[in-house]
Design a protein with these regions (language model features):
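ABC ATP-binding cassette signature C-motif
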Residues: 1-255, 305, 309-514
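Intracellular alpha-helical coupling/juxtamembrane segments of multi-pass membrane proteins
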Residues: 243-276, 280-286, 290-297
């Protein structure tokens, strides 16, 4: 298989250059993790590579692209909603897949008058040795929790639609998989299965993920997008962390030297008369270039969050013999739990077992079927749910936060302006006046999280907070939660995040909470 070569790829969206003259090579059987702060163009790069979006210029930057059949897992699947799950998953034009689809349809709607046709299909499957593929189809569907194959995809939840698209991509006749956040809406066991499946698939993979264990286990190389450029690192995520730290040390040392030189040149500039000789112009030009480099700072922004919180009393949250049922299905039964001020509770379990229900009962958006949830009088809850609520996308970024506060008081007593806070949280000044609707999905979640924290909560409820957040933001969030004065309850499938944040685990298993 030829290498997929990309040379001097440039892409602009409106007046923003997303990436400029980036070049890289994708080798056969590579598994490349694509990382970068939200808004740097990770999804845009996958769009361009897949052909969903175009590139700048008239000359193609791609070599040997036609050797690759690309399967693309997007964040928002575009399906024919009238088609069934079976027809959607098995949409490949591969003969074996077509036979499997026909076989499954006959088995779903079996009658005696279809027996002869069924036998004919089975004989063809025998001749093409398609039963191994059929077994793989069954395994993929089972592992992803896709059961009712006759349901129209238009009737599925967002999470199930994503799993259907993931199955479609995994089972398609592709040799290059572009996967945008493949672990979203998957539980831990399914993520572990997916890791092994991709490792054994003999396919080339380029993927975006916030799940650092998944990234570490799967990747053989890391591509990092930053400030319209792309940097490559050999190895997995742990290798990237080590190599990046070494590079940051070199960058810091170089910046220090430039700052010292800038001070010397600034003193020289101040000593010179306004009408400078032409022969000095080259030195003057170098001074202005140096000024730009020094004012740009180091490559990585040091993100910090240290917000003042409201006081919390001894009584926080208590579940007293709480039961809850949904459509006659018991979710909680005589459940008791005392949440104390310093608790860091991770909530885990399969999809649909009631993890989010627990948070909704605390938030008051659901009422128990029996028992009661007692909330302390001083409790002030911030609920970071999977669906962003109350985010008026017609507003401008800085105005959205200034409606809550003009400045932020930290736990140390100092104050920070909203503009400075936005910069610390990776919103450059150029974005402060932008409409929220122009932000990426991850940037919107980051902005929403900032708003919640500005409201000075003393209890945090987090429902899958790592979805759509970049790794840099997750690191800051983890550090913030470790220093947060009140209790934190978080539903998450992100094992790395839970290991860093949670000191207790509530596990939904076999209809019980352990």
């Amino acid at each position: 298989m030829s290498d997929f070569i990309v040379e001097k790829l440039t892409k602009s969206v409106g007046d923003k250059t997303v990436f400029k003259d980036i070049s890289f090579i994708i080798h056969d059987l590579d598994r490349i993790g694509l990382i970068g702060v939200n808004g740097t163009g990770k999804t845009t790069l996958l769009d361009v590579l897949s052909g969903v979006s175009g590139f700048d210029g008239d000359v193609s930057p791609f070599s040997a692209k036609n050797d690759y059949q690309i399967g693309y897992l997007t964040q928002d699947p575009d399906f024919d909603d009238s088609k069934t799950v079976l027809d959607t998953v098995l949409s490949s034009d591969l003969k074996e897949i077509q036979l499997i689809r026909e076989y499954e349809l006959l088995m779903l709607n079996y009658s005696e008058d279809k027996q002869a046709r069924l036998e004919r299909v089975m004989a063809e499957m025998d001749s093409l040795q398609a039963w191994e593929i059929e077994s793989q189809v069954k395994t993929v569907l089972s592992k992803l929790g896709i059961q009712d194959l006759s349901t129209p995809v238009g009737e599925l939840s967002g999470g199930l639609r994503r799993r259907v698209q993931l199955a479609q991509v995994l089972l398609g006749n592709h040799n290059l998989l572009l996967l945008d956040e493949p672990t979203n809406h998957l539980d831990i066991a399914t993520i572990e299965w997916l890791t092994l499946f991709l490792k054994n698939s003999k396919k080339t993979v380029l993927f975006i993920t916030h799940d650092r264990y998944f990234l570490d286990a799967l990747s053989t190389r890391i591509f990092e997008l930053d400030r319209a450029g792309l940097t490559e690192y050999q190895g997995n995520y742990q290798d990237y962390v080590r190599l990046k730290a070494e590079q940051d040390e070199r960058d810091a040392a170089l910046l220090h030297k430039k700052e010292q030189l800038y001070k010397q040149e600034l003193a020289w500039m101040r000593r010179q008369p306004q009408a400078r000789a032409t022969k000095q112009q080259a030195r003057i030009n170098r001074f202005h270039d140096l000024k730009k480099e020094v004012s740009g700072g180091v490559a990585e922004t040091d993100l910090t969050m240290n917000f003042e919180t409201s006081r919390i009393g001894k009584k926080v949250i208590e579940f007293q013999d709480v039961s809850f049922a949904y459509e006659n299905k018991p979710i909680l039964q005589d459940f008791n739990l005392l949440v104390q001020a310093k608790d860091r509770i991770g909530i885990v379990g399969d999809n649909g077992v009631g993890k989010s229900t627990l948070l909704n009962l605390i938030a008051g958006s659901l009422e128990p079927t029996a028992g009661q949830v007692v909330i302390g009088e001083t409790v002030r809850i911030a609920y970071f749910s999977q669906q962003i609520e109350g985010l008026d996308e017609s507003k401008r970024v800085i105005n959205y936060l200034q409606e809550v506060a003009e400045e932020v008081k930290t736990s140390g007593g100092s104050t920070t302006s909203i503009a400075e806070l936005l910069e610390q949280f990776l919103f450059p000044r150029s974005t402060h006046g932008a409409l929220i609707e122009k932000l990426s999905g991850g940037e919107k979640k980051r902005l929403y999280l900032l708003k919640l924290l500005l409201e000075k909560p003393n209890v945090l409820l987090l429902d899958e907070p790592t979805n759509d957040l970049d790794i840099a933001t997750l690191t800051v969030l983890e550090n913030f939660l470790q220093g947060f004065a009140g209790p934190v309850l978080t539903v998450s499938h992100d094992r790395y995040f839970l290991d860093k944040v949670a000191t207790k685990i509530l596990a939904f298993e076999d209809g019980k909470i352990r």
